[in-house]
A protein has these predicted regions:
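Short, Lys/Arg-enriched C-terminal cap helix and immediately downstream tail that follows
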Residues: 181-194
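Sigma70-family region 2
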Residues: 14-18, 41-48, 60-78
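Helix-turn-helix DNA-binding module
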Residues: 155-175
Length: 194
């Protein structure tokens, strides 16, 4: 299946931003394949026998995307970037629920119910939470570098697409990507999840 025409997707996103509810119905078939690919990217480090499937992640992200009252997507790349951010937050919430179950407590339920918490091993949940804490610290130092990581690593966007979303040059994205990766590697080595 070919990816959707970026121009057509951008037009639909702009129509959605102007309140056209029918544009959402036309958009989803055009981006569903990309969202599933993005979900597979997000789940690539999970155990092979996990119960959390890309479809469940796409469905949860879709619910959050369409209920977001402040949606103002400028382009296909921006939409995919926002989708990646939402999917990452869903996985972090999922890891937190897994840790809460492990300790005997349970936070609120979502479409990714507690049965799916078994999809993450204890180590994977801990690593995801450690990465999330490191990204929070990176945010304090450089919002743009955190966004570059989110868009490149979690969103699978190229340097050029990331530059478009962030309104910077591709060389700036490449510099930020290198700096952020180096910094995060150091943080991941020295910080246990808390």
């Amino acid at each position: 299946m070919q990816p959707a025409d970026p121009g057509e997707v951008t037009v639909l996103l702009q129509q959605i931003g102007h309140g056209d509810a029918h544009a959402v119905e036309r958009l989803i078939p055009l981006v569903l394949h990309e969202l599933r690919t993005l979900a597979r990217l997000q789940l690539r480090n999970e155990r092979p026998d996990h119960t959390l499937q890309p479809t469940a992640l796409v469905n949860e992200a879709y619910i959050r995307l369409v209920t977001d009252q402040a949606r103002n997507w400028q382009s296909r790349a921006h939409f995919i970037g926002v989708s990646a951010s939402i999917m990452r937050r869903i996985l972090v919430d999922h890891a937190r629920r897994r840790q809460a179950l492990k300790r005997g407590g349970l936070s609120r339920r979502s479409a990714l119910d507690t049965e799916n918490c078994a999809a993450l091993s204890d180590q994977q949940a801990e690593e995801l939470l450690t990465l999330n804490m490191a990204l929070d610290r990176l945010e304090e130092m450089s919002h743009r570098q955190r966004r570059v990581v989110e868009l490149r690593y979690f969103g699978g966007l190229s340097s050029e697409e990331t530059a478009e979303v962030l309104n910077v040059s591709p060389i700036t994205v490449k510099r930020d990507w290198l700096a952020a990766k180096t910094w995060l590697k150091g943080q991941m080595r020295h910080q246990p999840a808390g």
